[in-house]
Amino acid sequence: MNKLLNWVDERLPVVDAWNKHVGKYYAPKNFNVWYFFGSLAMLVLVNQLITGIWLTMSYNPSAEGAFASVEYIMRDVQWGWLLRYLHSTGASAFFVVVYLHMFRALMYGSYQKPRELIWIFGMLIYLVLMAEAFMGYLLPWGQMSYWGAQVIVNLFGAIPVIGDDLSLWIRGDYLISGITLNRFFALHVVALPIVLLGLVVLHILALHEVGSNNPDGIDIKKNKDENGIPKDGIPFHPYYTVHDLMGVGVFFFIFFVVVFFFPEMGGLFLEKPNFQPANPLQTPEHIAPVWYFTPFYAMLRAVTVDFIGLPAKFWGVMVMGGAIAILFVVPWLDRSPVRSMRYKGMLSRSALAIFVLSFIILGYLGLVPATAGRTTVAQILTVFYFLFFLLMPFYTRMEKTKPVPERVTG
């Protein structure tokens, strides 16, 4: 066996790769519960890929057969109902762990120098994940899938001059049809997963090149022993591979409780209108995207005034796009001399708390029908959302920070 491994290693550096990225990759010894979510995101990604492959085997990507094939999977394919619930619950679980992963990065300054590329790759993963979720959302060909896709694609029509042609190009038809379903299926099953996997690899390579951040925001490479090993670091394997098993166990418990007992999650994961086949002639009472898009949808609806000759719909699209785009420049907006919220001042802590609260409430407002009062609240919270980023260069530079220790703490 050793001879075989040596033969392979001479031609493919398997052992070197293992040592660099796992066995001899030294991670800070003070990781806490917030550091579970990166590995959990990988776990959910594997779940989505495996269940997606099996669902594709029985799915019919046509306007005539899509809805019926989903019902066939649920009723006649052995364990088909489980595969679908694993996939639909996994989609929401993916966004849960990704949002928590992003929150941890904001909390501990994991985007600051020299980790800007890690953040950029992470944001690209988030963007591709949103596209992947949107494409997959149409595939059940239910009422909410159909009309939700119709609303989102029509948003591109708000762009001056090219909007209508762009919407037509995305749909491949004058309305959402089997042609749209086919191209969304191809993107969801083939193109976007390839891009997603590539970005995940780049994200991990960039992380392992500069090293992991930690709750103190301290670079452990600055304190090494006589062997060149960080004094505050421990090998990722076996310490964190075993450590992460606890997080995986807790996650699986919650995940499977949802899968087996609450797969629809009261209409948040699987909406009731989606149990009816798509009907282009009948609009649902209330059209709303899946919960993980609703904060941005609430921002879109919050814009109600035409400006400089352009309709409110256009400005709503700009606000929604800007809310995502501004995340990419966070590494250059934060001017704080420290990374972690543990040592930042009250201004940064208060700003982050208001930002998170605004995002959560916007998520709720995007789920429910718009009223005058809700629209006003959404407008205020949208302003808070953007102020968190736009004022960041000022409050992070002005505030008084705490002294950062030379070595990591517990």
Predicted regions and their residues:
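Membrane-embedded and interfacial regions of multi-pass energy-transducing membrane proteins
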Residues: M1-A93, V97-G410
